[in-house]
A protein has these predicted regions:
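Active-site microenvironment for binding and transforming phosphate-containing groups
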Residues: 1-266
Length: 266
């Protein structure tokens, strides 16, 4: 797996990108907490920022993030509920899901995180793309696998897919209780646990890799490396800030011009 690359814009906005997704033609970005002129780049939905960012400021930041993708593209999100639900853009406002698929180069599929795992997936052959939000509950429910199944239903082949895993809380910072340990054990993710004495810890990065591999992705089709939101000042951390923190966006745009005659049926 290749690590994500840090890109710094002329206004000093910092985002992370995947070399594999970029080489395949997918416009995408994982935001950080570092915005233009080093402002705190909170991409929470306007009016709902846990750190109290002014709604007008949130709106300006969202427009700035969208400019990373060129053109005048809307950012398409869902109401995230820690599930295995997958929506397809355009989704109705308030749609509850934890992944969103785009089928062309119009809207930006995006998810919000501040410790959970953001995953971006693209299929170069069909042009399909998806953004996925995966906390421990979503990994137990296998939202990565559900997203890959939904992409296959729309013509993607697993061997075509490229995935990039963004920053999330690391194993040293993610202390979990017995209920989480039991849930991960039952979901076949026991190898992603570091058990006590004392409290146990969970490795969300490795759990994500495990889910992607179980869904059929090869290791050399996955980009990313452990980047801990709780210990790296470039990122927001819900747990590290006791809830009063900003939100990242991870976004991706599909590739237009897909020929329907190339779409396979499953």
């Amino acid at each position: 797996m290749n690590p994500l690359r840090e890109d710094r814009a002329s206004d000093r906005l910092v985002v992370l990108r995947s070399n594999r997704l970029e080489a395949a033609g997918f416009q995408h970005a994982f935001s950080t907490a570092i915005g233009p002129d080093r402002e705190i780049f909170d991409l929470a939905a306007p009016g709902s920022s846990p750190m109290g960012t002014d709604p007008a400021t949130n709106e300006a930041f969202l427009r700035r993030f969208a400019r990373e993708f060129g053109g005048n593209r809307p950012i398409t999100t869902v109401t995230q509920v820690h599930s295995a639900g997958v929506a397809v853009a355009p989704a109705a406002p308030g749609t509850e899901a934890d992944a969103i698929i785009v089928e062309d180069s119009g809207p930006i599929a995006a998810v919000r995180t501040a410790d959970c795992v953001p995953i971006l997936i693209g299929c170069p052959r069909t042009g399909l793309a998806a953004a996925v939000h995966a906390g421990w509950r979503g990994l137990v429910a296998d939202v990565p696998g559900a997203t890959i199944n939904a992409l296959r239903d729309r013509g993607a082949e697993t061997d075509d897919l490229i995935a990039a895993i963004g920053p999330a809380i690391g194993i040293d910072a993610f202390e979990v209780g017995d209920d989480v340990v039991a849930a991960l054990d039952a979901a076949g993710l026991a190898t992603c646990l570091r058990r006590g004495p004392g409290r146990s810890h969970a490795d969300l990065f490795e759990a994500t890799v495990s889910r992607l591999r179980s869904a059929g992705l090869k290791q050399d089709r996955i980009d990313g490396h452990p980047l801990c939101t709780a210990s790296d000042e470039r990122f927001f951390s819900h747990r590290g800030a006791s809830g009063r923190t900003g939100r990242h966006l991870a976004g991706i745009v599909g590739i237009g011009g897909f020929d329907e005659s190339n779409r396979s049926v499953h």
